[in-house]
A protein has these predicted regions:
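HAD-like aspartate-dependent phosphatase fold
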Residues: 1-169
Length: 169
């Protein structure tokens, strides 16, 4: 079976992580929402400037075109959201203020989950920022479960039944 995850990272990063945990024998292949979004970006935005919304640990997803990353939001052609900034993890209002005047730009969400529970701590995910962008009138392109593109890209599933087991949104 294919392990499909909403991790905003390349397939290879997650495969390496699973191997270290001794889990290689439990799956045939791995496909991440990060890999799906990367494929889309390489095909559609290869030479465009982007502004990354998310923690630095997620930036390995964009190594192939990091020269297109801008630190000034005003210079961005589009946004890539992998999560929340480390210094703004709890206040979603920050993102509304940050993005309000940019609702005409594309917004790529690499993990549509709204929240994640890490032990006893509940944290916002990239999907929460994407929802705010939609609320201010922006258009979001989602990659990850439950959106169809990630299934279509992860395996040749046309005409096949798919069982998806998730934990939350």
């Amino acid at each position: 079976f294919v392990l499909l995850t909403n991790a905003p990272r390349p397939n290879s990063t997650v495969i390496d992580f699973l191997k270290k945990m001794g889990l290689k024998k439990f799956y045939e292949d791995v496909y991440t929402s990060g890999e799906a979004s990367l494929k889309y970006l390489m095909e559609n935005f290869l030479n465009s400037k982007f502004y990354h919304i998310g923690p630095p640990r997620d930036f390995d997803l964009f190594k192939r075109f990091e020269q297109n990353k801008v630190s000034n939001i005003n210079q961005a052609d589009y946004f890539i959201c992998t999560g929340l900034f480390e210094d703004h993890e709890t206040k979603l209002e920050y993102y509304k203020d940050l993005l309000e005047k940019f609702s005409n730009k594309k917004f790529v969400c690499t993990n549509p989950d709204l929240i994640v529970d890490r032990g006893d701590v509940r944290e916002f995910c990239a999907g929460s920022v994407a929802k705010i962008f939609e609320e201010i009138g922006g258009k979001v392109i989602y990659f990850g479960k439950p959106y169809p593109p990630v299934y279509n890209l992860s395996a040749n599933i046309n005409g096949k039944n798919v069982l998806c087991i998730g934990d939350n949104m």
